Amino acid sequence: MAQWPEKEEEEQPMFGEEYTGYIPSYLEKDEPCVVCGDKATGYHYRCITCEGCKGFFRRTIQKNLHPSYSCKYDCCCIIDKITRNQCQLCRFKKCIAVGMAMDLVLDDSKRVAKRRLIEENRERRKKEEIVKTLQNRPEPTGAEWELIRMVTEAHRHTNAQGAQWKQKRKFLPDKIGQSPVAPTSDGDKVDLEAFSEFTKIITPAITRVVDFAKKLPMFSEQLPCEDQIILLKGCCMEIMSLRAAMRYDPESETLTLSGEMAVKREQLKNGGLGVVSDAIFDLGKSLAQFNLDDTEVALLQAVLLMSSDRSGLTCMDKIEKCQETYLLAFEHYINYRKHNIPHFWPKLLMKVTDLRMIGACHASRFLHMKVECPNELFPPLFLEVFEDQEV
């Protein structure tokens, strides 16, 4: 004698009293399930049904449960929202009667294959969207191309040795910068011989940053001299650090300073820069992955130069607008270049933050160098640029 079946567990508890998830647009408002009359959620196995009846029908077919179903009342049960769990046989028969298709229920292997196909299609659509988005991103206008050309030329004319830096560099001898002698108050040490070597190249390096800025019409023609000086003092270390970081060589693990002197991390650190050395070397390693061209480096420098938050500026609004102009041209140029790195533009902008941090750390570090190193070792231009900076 057939036993009364256990009460069927619903598949809906996750939805609460009423399913409130995605409802297809082809359904009428509050359209009923053709099996039990509950609120339908879509077209399932050729019929418009609720989640509960969809799940019941799928489980029944997948697990081949229907041969074991029985009815206590000669298959005359009325199936509605309240009674649907009381008789599995009558519920299943009604599913068949209203047209639910057994052949559309997938077994485990087919279900896995279908999910994989859905996932592959989803990924394909994502890639197509990315390509479409990239194709639709604006590229530089005619005016922006002219601005980009001027900034790039300014950089190339003031970037020592240009693309030949590897052939023309000279390595600082290992014996220099490896034996620090003067302890500083923050626990680091300064090798005076290395410090002396670095000061020999600092003046031309600073001069090249000044020349770069003066070649930009927005800087030299639109801003008062006082603001020009403040901007140059603020960005000088940042731009020199960027130029050095772009000449990081992973094979020799060196940075080439001012296009001529290749130094190791410890040499730069012991020569006065301390922890700032680590930050510049780390930046060099990171930037190597970006494969930046001259134009991108030039535009980065222009963005650093036109920082309207430097203390003491009088034309902040004008400087901010100048920076926005460079940023927009920069973004459009990045769109034109079509890099393969995800989120390339925001990641590159984070390097501006890193360079600003390097500049701030160097301002603090400069105070230690002033205390620990003989005053005669400091070139006048070095003192003029970095003295009286906010820490």
Swiss-Prot record:
Pfam families: Hormone_recep, zf-C4
Subcellular location: Nucleus
Disulphide bonds in the chain: none
GO cellular component labels: RNA polymerase II transcription regulator complex
Keywords annotated in UniProt: DNA-binding, Metal-binding, Nucleus, Receptor, Transcription, Transcription regulation, Zinc, Zinc-finger
Zinc finger (NR C4-type): 33-53, 71-95
Molecular function in Gene Ontology: nuclear receptor activity; RNA polymerase II cis-regulatory region sequence-specific DNA binding; zinc ion binding
SMART domains (UniProt xref): HOLI, ZnF_C4
InterPro entries from the UniProt entry: NHR-like_dom_sf, Nucl_hrmn_rcpt_lig-bd, Nuclear_hormone_rcpt_NR1, Nuclear_hrmn_rcpt, ThyrH_rcpt, Znf_hrmn_rcpt, Znf_NHR/GATA
Chief location of this protein within or outside the cell: nucleus
Regions recorded as binding DNA: 33-100
Domain NR LBD: 143-388
KW DNA repair (keyword) present: no
Entry comment, domain topic: Composed of three domains: a modulating N-terminal domain, a DNA-binding domain and a C-terminal ligand-binding domain.
Family assignment from sequence similarity: Belongs to the nuclear hormone receptor family. NR1 subfamily.
Name of the protein described by the UniProt record: Thyroid hormone receptor alpha-B
Source organism (scientific name): Paralichthys olivaceus (Bastard halibut)
Gene that encodes the chain: thra2
